[in-house]
Curated annotation (Swiss-Prot):
It comes from the Eukaryota. Keywords: Guanine-nucleotide releasing factor, Nucleus. It is found in: Nucleus. PANTHER family: GUANINE NUCLEOTIDE EXCHANGE FACTOR, RAP GUANINE NUCLEOTIDE EXCHANGE FACTOR 5. Residues 578-813 form the Ras-GEF domain. GO terms for biological process: small GTPase-mediated signal transduction. One of its GO terms (cellular component) is nuclear body. Residues 43-118 form the DEP domain. InterPro entries: DEP_dom, Ras-like_GEF, Ras-like_Gua-exchang_fac_N, Ras_G-nucl-exch_fac_CS, Ras_GEF_dom_sf, RASGEF_cat_dom, RASGEF_cat_dom_sf, Ubiquitin-like_domsf. The lineage of its organism: Eukaryota, Metazoa, Chordata, Craniata, Vertebrata. This is Rap guanine nucleotide exchange factor 5.
Amino acid sequence: MTTGDCQTLSRRISNPYLEHSPSQIYGENSSCAGRALRNIIILQAADLVKDRVNLKGFYRRSCVGSELVDWLLEHCPFVQCRSMAIGVWQLLLDMGIMSSVDQHLYFQDNYVFYQFSSDECSYLYCEFEREEEWQKGVKLLLELVHLIPARAGICDLSHQKTEDSEESSDEILARLTSAVQRELAAVIALKARKSAIEQDDENADKHVTVTEANNGPDPQAGVMCKLQERDDIGRIELVHKLARENCQFLQTEKKESEKLEQQDDEVTMVQVKEQGQSVLVLKKVASCGPAPTSGSAENDARYVVVSGTPEKILEHLLNDLHLAEVQHKETETLLDDFLLTYTVFMTTDDLCQALLRHYSAKKYQGEEENSDVPCRKRKVLHLVSQWISLYKDWLHEDEHSKMFLKTIYRNVLDDVYEYPILEKELKEFQKILGVYRRHTVDEYSPQKKNKALFHQFSLKENWLQHRGTVAETEEIFCHVYITEHSYISVKAKVSSTAQEILKVVAEKLQRAEEDLALVAITFSGEKHEFQPNDLAISKSLEASGRIYVYRKDLADTLNPLAENEESQQRSMRILGMNTWDLALELMSFDWSLFNSIHEQELIYFTFSRQGNGENTVNLSLLLQRCNEVQLWVATEILLCSQLGKRVQLVKKFIKIAAHCKAQQNLNSFFAIVMGLNTASVSRLSQTWEKIPGKFKKLFSELESLTDPSLNHKAYRDAFKKMKPPKIPFMPLLLKDVTFIHEGNKTFLDNLVNFEKLHMIADTVRTLRHCRTNQFGSDVSPKEQQELKSYVNHLYVIDSQQALFELSHRLEPRA
């Protein structure tokens, strides 16, 4: 079988083994039984169908193979063993009712992702359509398991490698530290060696002998490649090459000149030990900093941190800092890496105490000259100023950092009389901390210590107060439910009153505010009506209940799902909006969320595994927004009862997605495309048939950018070409950070694996690059107000079951 035949074979979903349809092989009812099993999984085991991430990409609504087997064994007593359950799922895979995201031909009972198709039964009457009949379908499938083709005769496609897949492997390897790469290289080399030995035993008469001859190499003796002294045998790509070419390693005696050269060769790795224990590991790299003043080659190379204890990493960082305007690139990167990731291996209090020790130390690495004391103090102050600049208002809420800054500010006041050179750092410190009073050197003398000055600083603390308290300023998405499964999303401060939220909801529903009321209903059924001045938002309420909007003259909630004038007006409203301006307003709203995310939030999100914690508020908002935009697209389309207007809506959303891509808002772009691909929308065959060909072609091009194959290569290539400002697809960025975290240990031999933290910080700095330039909207003020009101408060249905019911109501099964 040729490569083309194998590739064609791998793409066939309906039946990957035979040229006959599933109905011809398994019978007419087999597909109905398979779809019934799929539908019951979606309805009764929705927790198994979720968005998932693995090393290759992000997959929507996927299931895990082993979990599907467990579920079938639990709910079908007549399925007696795992092999029987595997056979049932293999039938669904053969029939195209489910597919492997990795395009595997066989169902695997392990952590492999599968996705269900959204096609419906084409028969007018299906005996397995009712929920209670699905187990009969499973019994039918069990009877057909013996018809599954034997695996031995199937073409193995595992060796069909492509250039793109090799590029994807290189990208994955780039996210592994050198320690992990060396371990992989050792395993591959060992495997290659065992394979070569076995081959030599089988083909002893075909081996090639390499001999050393005085008259030169034998032309029939094969090719001997020599590894130079500086070739790194730990490099994964070198081992790959040697294994492919079936090379064997031969040890030869070094010539005298080579031995001398080796002795003169400089060390590339340095270990610092204390009491026999390694405390710091450094690696030599070529310097990318300013040109050295002297011609020494030593100045052209620097050492970067591979691993170490927290104290030694900080000590090396301070030693490496210099007080010139331009730092070496390695030093600048080390400083930024340390400040971004220090919370992984030490607390803020530990860092504060360590910095105070370095600032106040009488001796530093032995006897210190008096001239080095102010230099060391200035380095500590430089690090602190960079820390404040990077974290900004994050430090305002930490008691340890506030006390530390007060203490070190007082120490600088005490020291500036003895070391006048610190006056520049003091003024910069005062500017950062908001102390604007001017001082002279005389004022800092021990005889004139100005206690009132520090008291003034303690009382004022402008830099601590400009945001207000967390309770007053924190913003969240408040969900005001209209029915059990539909809500209006309102971005509001935690301190918002019920009247403020009700005003937004009334405007969205186009009803009089005085006719509506907000009611909190707990999951136990208790009701509490909010008064106008009550605080409506509570984190405790999020976990225990919901906020509903009621009409005061009715005992029930509003019902926007009915085919009434309100739903028609909503469709007409969006159809009358300019798609470019609507995309701009989406960009403006998303940019406000994206611009508020602190780089540190990605670190907390990855290491704490808490996506909604206090330290990841802004990141959680943007992720939630992505989900809401996807639901909004499906909601608007499925609430439109007229076929003609529904076709216009789909065209509208395709254009909005294209504009989001053009405006470099990849977060909303992905959300809209995924919303159009939602099963409840994609099944509307009558609607999609009426979409013009040029729109279908445009949508196909947009879909190609969301293709998860080869680790989202299409998206990554397009994103690299975009210039700031731009908004990345945040779930994918988080996946990259998570992959680095899970693929590399945080500690190696009780030392901080700083090489891993550097890779994480480098990925996190993507946010900084995207925000190099700021976004500005060009929408006219009058139009902007209407668009802003619409975009900021989206109306969505968050129940997949409710969306499917609407979908079947619009276009029932044939």
